[in-house]
């Protein structure tokens, strides 16, 4: 019973940090032409790296006009996207090849 209670207490903490890979690195997964997680909270004023892991069999073009990023990522491949320090606010990104479903937001705080 103690293990079950501990699992319920720890699970939300583990999920909250799921996108954070290492200091300043955040992982985004493309699956079924959607970003997971769709929203990532990042610290304002710091450089960061997005590790975009495309788990779909087809390519996707990761793009943001808000923080000026663009990279084609082949199916089953990963790529690093460097992002300059951001001011506090919301910054949209999308998959240009599947714009109707591949949408996401960086929230800099």
Regions found by a protein language model. Give the residues of each.
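Positively charged n-region of N-terminal signal peptides that target proteins for export
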Residues: 1-9
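Sec/Tat signal peptide C-region and signal peptidase I cleavage site
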Residues: 15-21
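N-terminal edge beta-strand
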Residues: 22-45
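Extracellular/periplasmic metallocenter environments
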Residues: 27, 74-109
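Beta-strand-rich interaction surfaces with strong enrichment in secreted/lumenal proteins
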Residues: 38-40, 68-72
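Short beta-strand/loop motifs in extracellular/secreted proteins, especially
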Residues: 48, 58-60, 102-104
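Asparagine-centered strand-capping/turn motif at beta-strand->loop junctions
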Residues: 52-54
């Amino acid at each position: 019973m103690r293990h079950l209670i501990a699992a319920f207490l720890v699970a939300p903490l583990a999920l909250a940090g799921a996108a954070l890979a290492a200091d300043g690195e955040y992982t985004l997964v493309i699956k079924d032409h959607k970003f997971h997680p769709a929203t990532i909270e990042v610290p304002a004023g710091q450089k960061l790296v997005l590790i975009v892991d495309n788990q779909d069999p087809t390519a996707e073009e990761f793009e943001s006009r808000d923080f000026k990023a663009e990279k084609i990522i082949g199916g089953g491949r990963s790529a690093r996207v460097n992002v300059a320090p951001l001011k506090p606010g919301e910054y949209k990104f999308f998959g240009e090849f599947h714009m109707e479903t591949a949408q996401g937001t960086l929230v800099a705080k």
